[in-house]
């Protein structure tokens, strides 16, 4: 654990990784807290508001039982177990069962369609999947195309042909199971990337990935954990940000996690949930924060101690709104599926600079480099790289040695994100390499323009892309969701264009403005710029 301090440089100097040779996430996140005291592990809130508390003692018993179910089905160490569920008790339970048995779990977004599901299950060779009725409706149409998939466990509802009932199978199994003695470097989970280019790639992570996340989680959540902490995120528990920024670090530290299955994010319902369950630590993706600001949320019962966000730069306007609404700073972090939480913020360690991702996490050596792994001078644009080895980094891309090789250069993992580091050590995200807009000889990153647009009083959300231009190579186009009380018009579009011209530069203003009711998003709340580019 990090020692609480206000001296960032000393915190980094004194940090030492302590990765034990033998390590299993089930033991670390469950068994060591299952002491008979009944301390809560998961607080699940159903759609109707009813809640169920599950203790670490119960979670240990349940996960041992389901590990026996997996073993009885003939699965062995290294086999893959897929989880196609939204936030629920069954999700961490099944992960822990797979970890116990030395198997590899595969989280799958509940919103995945048939094609996305088929690719990931076929590519991973999953032998068992745990899902619910809505997941089974999608799965049964492709089941015949998945010869390696032997077992489908159904949560809730009546088991139908081709499925097995999850809870009856678990309850009938023995609670005695000897957790496999795994090495810290043994495979534990495959998390598929969002597939911005080509098919998604499966990042194979080891048990040590949890330990690699802890320094940033502890820093960003203001030296987490502290007495009374309770953690929640609206993000799907299939994303590395929800799993390893929230769920497993909380369980590792013995902190209760609130889970809630919602059809869509409701800002006012989110505030009520946090008040009802005394949530103190949240991970709120930028989209959630923007929607909360748009809804002008307030609730006297919300008493947050820490707010973490990441995935898109927030900008000064949103930072100010969070500060005035919740009375604390929002701490942004940066990472990716392959190598997460390498950079972050903590206002007690150094001042927050709007638009910056923060500084390198203790234990991480982050640099701006070229594509050969050579370090670039401070202030220069380049690829954000993380020096290796680092316990948070994936083992490899599953069954994809060529992509694995391309992910590294010299001593560094290449994030594929462009950024710069200023003289004070702050990192600034510029864009994905494939998001850069080339216009009239300039290379322009969309994030700075989007940040500027959010400062205009009419703009609730925005996304900026490049569209083909025979003269300029690309022209800048802004897709804008308006705040309540504003109506789309040519006059407003011109006003917004002039606003960016004045605030940024003449070559950075959007020559085209498209008003829209919503923006296409990934399941993790990131804007799908490629879909907007395809629309022209």
Language-model regions, residue ranges each:
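Conserved AMP-binding/adenylation subdomain of ANL enzymes
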Residues: 211-233, 238-280, 295
